[in-house]
Amino acid sequence: MNHKDWDLVNRRLVAKMLSELEYEQVFHAESQGDDRYCINLPGAQWRFIAERGIWGWLWIDAQTLRCADEPVLAQTLLMQLKQVLSMSDATVAEHMQDLYATLLGDLQLLKARRGLSASDLINLNADRLQCLLSGHPKFVFNKGRRGWGKEALERYAPEYANTFRLHWLAVKREHMIWRCDNEMDIHQLLTAAMDPQEFARFSQVWQENGLDHNWLPLPVHPWQWQEKIATDFIADFGEGRMVSLGEFGDQWLAQQSLRTLTNASRRGGLDIKLPLTIYNTSCYRGIPGRYIAAGPLASRWLQQVFATDATLVQSGAVILGEPAAGYVSHEGYAALARAPYRYQEMLGVIWRENPCRWLKPDESPFLMATLMEWDENNQPLAGAYIDRSGLDAETWLTQLFRVVVVPLYHLLCRYGVALIAHGQNITLAMKEGVPQRVLLKDFQGDMRLVKEEFPEMDSLPQEVRDVTSRLSADYLIHDLQTGHFVTVLRFISPLMVRLGVPERRFYQLLAAVLSDYMKKHPQMSERFALFSLFRPQIIRVVLNPVKLTWPDLDGGSRMLPNYLEDLQNPLWLVTQEYES
C-alpha cells in the first residue's frame, strides 16, 4: 500500500457516501455556483465540484473534495454522520468495520486493475472481468464481508480472483428439501462439478461410506464448512443424518455476489450458489429454505414463457435455468421461531445454468454492471464497447434498451411478473461490441407477482405462487424503476455524457424505445396504463440511512428500506420537454 492509493480509495468512498446520502435526503448540498457545492455537517463543511444529474444525484469529482485542512478520510465522514443519524457508538463501530473492509477491497481492485485501459478490461474473459467490478453501486460500504479476515478475503473474495475446491457432504434424503428438474439428474449435477477422475474418486468414497440412493450429495463452501457446518451440525453427523466426504472436484471462482461460484476448471457448465453466514451490504448471505422447492419450477415456467411468447422470442432474451436446489434445516435452530434468520439459512445449494450454455459461437458474455465502470484514466468501459461495435453511441444505447428493457417490461405487463434486474442479475450477450440479447437469473426471492389475477399467469405452478410475494401494480412497477432504472441506468447515464450523450438524450432514447414497443402492442394498452413508466414521480428507495441505523444487525431480522414518493421521473421529464 502507498499513500497515493490510500488517498484515492478514501476520496472515492467519501464521494460515494456524500452523493448517495444526499440523494437519500440525509442532508442537502448547497450550490455555490460554477458546479461548486458544499455540505454542512456538525462541526465540518465538505466542499467539492460536482454535476447534478437528471435524477437529482450528484456526480462528485473526488479529487476536488475538501474538509477544511483535514485529510480526506472516509472514517472522518462516518464519525461526522454519527450525530446526523443519531448513531450509537456501538453502531458506528460496526459500520467502521465495514468501512475498513471496503477500503481494503478497493485497494486490491486498484492494484488488480492498474495499467489496464478500458479496452484491455473488456478484452478479459467474463469471469476475470467480473472479479474487477466495483460492487454494489448504492450501498456505501459494499465489501464489508463481516466475518471474514484477511486470509478468508484473499482466498474467497472476487477481487483476489483465487480459486478453490468445494467440500462435499452426503445428506439423508428425508432430511433434505430437494427439487430437481425432470431434465436433470444427480449424476449430471456431479459431473458438472467434477471431471471423470475426480468423479471416480468421489464415487469410491461414496461407496466406502455405504451410501446409496437414499442419500443426496451436497456441496458446501469451504469457509462455511470450516466455520459453521462442521461445528453447528455436529448432531447431524453424530446421529447419522449427514456424512462429511471431503473436498472434491473442480476449482471454483467467486462471483460478485460471493455466494455464486463459477467453474474455473471447465467453463460453460453449471454455476453453484452456496450460503455464506457473513454479513455483506445489508444482510447475512445465507440461502432460505422458503423458496428452494419452488425455484426450479419457477425457472422452468419462465423458460417456457420466453420460448413461446412472440415478443420475447424476437428479443432473444434467455432465462438461466435453476435445474436443482436443496436445503437442510438445522433441527435445533429450527425449533427457535424467533432466532435470528442467519441460523435458519446455513446449509443449502442452488444449481444454475452458466450463461456460456446459451451463447452462440460468435458471442461473449458480460455483466451489465460492467457499464458502470471506468478505467484509471477515467475512460468508461461502455466507450470501449461502443468503439468496438463501430456504431455511434445513440444507436448503441438504443440497441441496449431494446434487448434489456423491452423484455423486462413485456414480462411485467403481459404476465404480471417482475424480476429485480440489477447489474449483477443481467448478463448481456455481445457480438463485436454490440448487445445482442439479455440473459436473466436469480428467481428465488428476486421474482414477484402482481396482486391482480392475469390469465397469462394461470399456468404458473401453485407451489411457486404460494411462496412468491404479490404486490399491487403501482408497487410492482418499482422493481423495474428502482431495480433497473435507479440501480443501473442512474450510474450509466452520467458516464455516457463523456461519450457525447447528454443525460436527457439518454432517457429520450429509452423513452423512444418504450414508446415504439407500446405502439406495436395496442392490445396491451390497459396493462401499459396499469404499469405506467411515465408518471411524474416515482418511489425513492432509501437504503444507507436505514442500514447505518438498523438496530438488529446481528441477523434478528432483515433490514427493510424506507420509501419516499418524491423522486422526479426522468422518463416523464424528457417526454414533457419533447412534447413542449
Curated annotation (Swiss-Prot):
Organism from which the protein derives: Escherichia coli
Family indicated by similarity: Belongs to the IucA/IucC family.
InterPro entries to which the protein is assigned, alphabetical: Aerobactin_biosyn_IucA/IucC_N, IucA/IucC-like_C, LucA/IucC-like
Keyword line: ATP-binding, Ligase, Nucleotide-binding, Plasmid, Transferase
Enzyme kind, highest EC tier: ligase
Coiled-coil spans in chain: none
Protein name (database record): Aerobactin synthase
Superkingdom in the source lineage: Bacteria
Molecular function GO terms recorded: aerobactin synthase activity; ATP binding; transferase activity
Reaction(s) catalysed by this chain's protein: N(2)-citryl-N(6)-acetyl-N(6)-hydroxy-L-lysine + N(6)-acetyl-N(6)-hydroxy-L-lysine + ATP = aerobactin + AMP + diphosphate + H(+)
Cross-referenced Gene3D superfamilies: 1.10.510.40, 3.30.310.280, 6.10.250.3370
GO annotation, biological process: aerobactin biosynthetic process; siderophore biosynthetic process
Pathway membership, UniProt: Siderophore biosynthesis; aerobactin biosynthesis
